[in-house]
Amino acid sequence: MEVTDVRLRRVNTDGRMRAIASITLDHEFVVHDIRVIDGNNGLFVAMPSKRTPDGEFRDITHPINSSTRGKIQDAVLNEYHRLGDTEALEFEEAGAS
């Protein structure tokens, strides 16, 4: 499995979310709403999730092994860094489409 495309838009929020990405796998399958989060130990990728009735968040889609998770995280964060400084980019308000 290869990540064959990454579409990323930065967001302007008060929280730790820095961007939202969509990835294409093997030119055949798209996963939307992957979040780039600025965590305590640096940037990381969070998979799409949904809040359960008891208030917990559960991933809707996720890789089942660390190798695949690494491929996805590397592809998304490489695109995030490729886009460069945030000053040169337009931001979208979180939740805007």
Curated annotation (Swiss-Prot):
Q: List the disulfide bonds.
A: none
Keywords associated with the record? Cell cycle, Cell division, Septation, Sporulation
Q: Does the keyword Transferase apply?
A: no
Pfam families assigned to the protein according to its UniProt record, in alphabetical order: SpoVG
One GO biological-process annotation of the entry reads:
division septum assembly
UniProt-listed SUPFAM superfamilies: SpoVG-like
Which family does the record claim for this protein?
Belongs to the SpoVG family.
Listed HAMAP family: SpoVG
Name the NCBIfam families on file.
PRK13259.1
What's this chain's function?
Essential for sporulation. Interferes with or is a negative regulator of the pathway leading to asymmetric septation.
User: Could you identify this protein by its name?
Assistant: Putative septation protein SpoVG
Q: Which organism is it from?
A: Bacillus subtilis (strain 168)
Its organism's taxonomic lineage begins at: Bacteria, Bacillati, Bacillota, Bacilli, Bacillales
